[in-house]
Amino acid sequence: PTIIEENNPVGIETVSAGASKNLTDILTQKIEESIGKENTEGFRTLNGQTLINAPKPEQLVEDLIAEAQKNFDPESLRPKISDASLKISEDNSREAFIKYFESFNKILLEASKNIPKTLFDENKMSISDFLKTKVVYEQATNSFYGLTVPRSLLDIHKKELELLLTKKNVFEKMANADQDPMTAFLAVDELLKIDLEFATLKADIEVWIKENKL
């Protein structure tokens, strides 16, 4: 068996393109509902002319998203991982590497069991799933902070933490969709990008393991 399990996605779970579209559909509806609440009067009459408080929700959503994208910085979702916050060991023995990757696997596989099964079921998904998923990522990152890492694996460790925390932050924004649907909508776009980075990281880990004959 390999050090990194074949079924270990490194990022706990992945988001398909179809699931991502479903997420944006849900959040678009939230934005439209928000617009509706702010324009409860609908049509009104002034000097004999019928006026509407807002354009069609669909067009307004597009306009709002375009404007919000100018002010949304995806990098704000990404934390900076400092060496001082980590448990770094100078033991770079084969045994230390194996122990690290065994713990690495255990953290992620245990976390994957706690992801809500309804998260990417288009018929059952709800915003409450986002909060539950955010908590799963938070717990996983806490475990990684508590994990002792051999210095030779520090870059891998920091990248894993960065991506886990970024995904936690994305789900946190999504969980707040009732209060801030626009930011939640924009945050969803980052999910597929993060998963691509997780895939790259997994490939890098596999190369490292092969080169070090673990």
Where in this protein do the model-derived segments appear?
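Extended aliphatic helical segments
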Residues: 10, 15, 61, 135-136, ...
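Amphipathic alpha-helical packing segments from all-alpha helical-bundle domains
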Residues: 132-140
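Short, solvent-exposed, charged loop/turn and helix-capping segments
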Residues: 140-158
